[in-house]
């Protein structure tokens, strides 16, 4: 099971260079398992025991396994994650031709570690909107090949590089795509038109706009003397998306189960398809009776907010509270913050710990040092919007928000096992 899950995760990461591709990858796997797509613009005719999914903005997705009994009886088991990761996004008018090189201007998306983006083989993917035969259409593209690089400045010209280097995103991050001769001008949108023709065999009249991200072309991989680790891009938080999907499909539960994977978590979640938007609430309102029954159902439900945790790094152990240093390959982490940066409380933490103990899955705890600030997740946002009880958990990770992150190769199986048990649980606290 562990080997198959790890291989599946690596394949999923490769197929999901952007939130758009991640959502499409999740939808493809759901459809293969018998889930039917619901269009938000149509009326829905759902039945008990039915399996459905809905997307918004092509970058967020909710999968619903409607229980055979009414949700009011047993409540709803929800797992939440996010599809986006810090990256470099292409600007609307990006062409830069300097010193005989074609470069693209980029904007930093989210709280990225910037130094690892240098000297990497980069490709480009995302969504392109274009006009064809008088109609406006959108399509996903992925160049796949390494088409760009951000070369470092040689240490001979930057003698203090190893003493602390503050990167200027405006000046230092535009990737190089090509060498150009003389006054030759390159039209980036024409390049996108060519890519649409290559990848989808369609002839766009004009590219109107796009949402494109650079990404590292190096595939995720098992590494270490004993293959103890998985190294790869976007583990935060596609690792949790994939774990939630595998648990949902494995559970085959008679209870009502939901998997929600939102976009825009890394930039605050405040969007139509983010956790701070109405997507989940509107979806549940369409599936559940109104008024009193809706509120009662939510109050009988529980959400597991799954987002990676900070594993204790052997070179930087002092960055953790001495009693709360999550270890890689030692199981999922219950995340606690008394200032509500995480939504965990004693009841939800206790129930998750109970599930782990019943499934013989190791479990850990994390609280940030008292002299450091704490990050957050979709957990508190979803809890405050829905009023649903929530526990924040995640798998320990190194190098979070780097271009290449690291997790334990045993932990995915741990998380899938306990999330499957959660979806199958007959009673919620």
Curated annotation (Swiss-Prot):
Family: Belongs to the peptidase M18 family.
Signal peptide: none
The gene coding this protein: apeB
Name of the featured protein: Probable M18 family aminopeptidase 2
The protein's Enzyme Commission number: 3.4.11.-
Cofactor(s) needed: Zn(2+)
InterPro entries: M18_aminopeptidase_2 (IPR022984), Peptidase_M18 (IPR001948), Peptidase_M18_dom2 (IPR023358)
GO BP term (any one): proteolysis
Residues that, per the record, bind Zn(2+): 82, 156, 401
EC class of the enzyme, as a word: hydrolase
GO molecular function, one term: zinc ion binding
Disulfide bonds: none
A Gene Ontology cellular-component term: cytoplasm
Keywords: Aminopeptidase, Hydrolase, Metal-binding, Metalloprotease, Protease, Zinc
One Pfam family recorded for the sequence: Peptidase_M18
């Amino acid at each position: 099971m562990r080997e198959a899950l790890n291989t599946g995760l690596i394949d999923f990461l490769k197929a999901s260079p952007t939130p758009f591709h991640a959502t499409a990858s999740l939808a493809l796997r759901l459809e293969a398992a018998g889930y039917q797509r619901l269009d938000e613009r149509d009326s829905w005719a759902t039945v008990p025991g039915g399996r459905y999914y809905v997307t918004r903005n092509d970058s967020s997705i909710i999968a619903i396994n409607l229980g055979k009994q009414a949700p009011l009886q047993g409540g709803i088991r929800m797992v939440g994650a996010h599809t986006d990761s810090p990256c470099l996004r292409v600007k609307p008018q990006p062409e830069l031709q300097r010193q005989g090189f074609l470069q693209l201007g980029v904007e930093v998306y989210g709280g990225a570690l910037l130094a690892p983006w240098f000297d990497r083989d980069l490709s480009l993917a995302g969504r392109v909107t274009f006009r064809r035969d008088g109609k406006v259409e959108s399509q996903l593209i992925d160049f796949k090949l390494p088409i760009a690089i951000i070369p470092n400045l040689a240490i001979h010209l930057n003698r203090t590089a190893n003493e602390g280097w503050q990167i200027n995103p405006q000046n230092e991050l535009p990737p190089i795509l090509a060498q150009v001769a003389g006054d030759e001008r390159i039209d980036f949108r024409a390049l996108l038109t060519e890519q649409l023709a290559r990848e989808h065999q369609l002839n766009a009249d004009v590219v109107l706009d796009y949402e494109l991200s650079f990404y590292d072309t190096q595939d995720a991989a098992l590494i270490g003397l004993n293959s103890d680790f998985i190294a790869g891009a976007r583990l935060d938080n596609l690792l949790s998306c994939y774990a939630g999907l595998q648990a949902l499909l494995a559970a085959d539960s008679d209870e009502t189960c939901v998997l929600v994977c939102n976009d825009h978590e890394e930039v605050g979640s405040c969007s139509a398809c983010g956790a701070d938007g109405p997507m989940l609430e509107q979806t549940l309102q369409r599936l559940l009776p109104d008024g009193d029954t809706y509120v009662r159902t939510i109050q009988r439900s529980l959400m597991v907010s799954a987002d990676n945790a900070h594993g204790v790094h052997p070179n930087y152990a002092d960055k953790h509270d001495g009693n709360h240093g999550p270890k890689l390959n030692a199981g999922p982490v219950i995340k606690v913050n008394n200032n509500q940066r995480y939504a965990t409380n004693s009841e939800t933490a206790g129930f998750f710990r109970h599930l782990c103990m019943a499934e013989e899955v190791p479990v850990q705890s994390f609280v940030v040092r008292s002299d450091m600030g704490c990050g957050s997740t979709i957990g508190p946002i979803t809890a405050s919007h829905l009023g649903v009880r929530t526990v924040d958990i995640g798998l320990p990770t190194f190098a979070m928000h780097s271009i290449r992150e690291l997790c334990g190769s045993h932990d995915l199986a741990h998380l899938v096992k306990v999330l499957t048990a959660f979806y199958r649980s007959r009673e919620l606290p």
